[in-house]
Amino acid sequence: MHESNLWVAWTLRSHDILTGALPSGLGLRDAAALTLIESHPGCSVDWLPARVGLTQSGAVRLVDRLESLGYLARTRAGRTVRLSLLPAGQDALREWNQAREAAGEEALSGLSPAQREQLTALLGLALSSTQRRRVEADTTCRLCDWSACRTCPVDASVEEP
C-alpha cells in the first residue's frame, strides 16, 4: 500500500507541475495534439482522437480551435484531411517543450545526478516492460519531445509494427 501511495503522490505532484507549466491558453490536450502532429507530419484528423483521449467529434473541435489560433492547417488529400503545424504552432510547441523541460527540472530538483540517472533507468525499465499496441505507445508519449529520446523505452514495448 505504501508503494502505491508513493506512486500516486509522485504522479499527482508531477501532473500539477506539468499543468502549471502550460503556456497561457493551452491545455494538456492542445499540447498533446501539437506534439503528435509535429512528430507525425501529415497525420489525419481520424488518427488523432484515440491518441489524445477524445471522441472523433471532440478531436474535430480541438483541431478547429487550434486552426482558429493559427497553429495548424488542414490539407485535403482525397477523402483524408491531413494536419500540419504552422509557424505559430511550431512556436507554441517550442514554448511548451521548454516549459516541460523546466517542469521536469523542478520535479527532479531534490535528486542528485546519480539519483536522477537511477530514476531514469528504472522508469525506462518500467515503461519498456509493459507490452502495448502502437496507438497506446503514441498515447503514452503524447507530451514527449520525440526527438529527445535516442532509444524510446515505450517504442521498445510495442507488440506490432
Task: Spell out what each predicted region is.
Residues 64-117:
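Charged, amphipathic alpha-helical coiled-coil/dimerization segments
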Residues 1-25:
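N-terminal leader segment of winged-helix/HTH proteins
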Residues 117-161:
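C-terminal regulatory/oligomerization modules of transcriptional regulators
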Residues 16-57, 137-140:
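N-terminal helix-turn-helix DNA-binding core of bacterial DNA-binding proteins
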Residues 17-21, 99-111, 125, 129:
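Generic non-transmembrane alpha-helical segments
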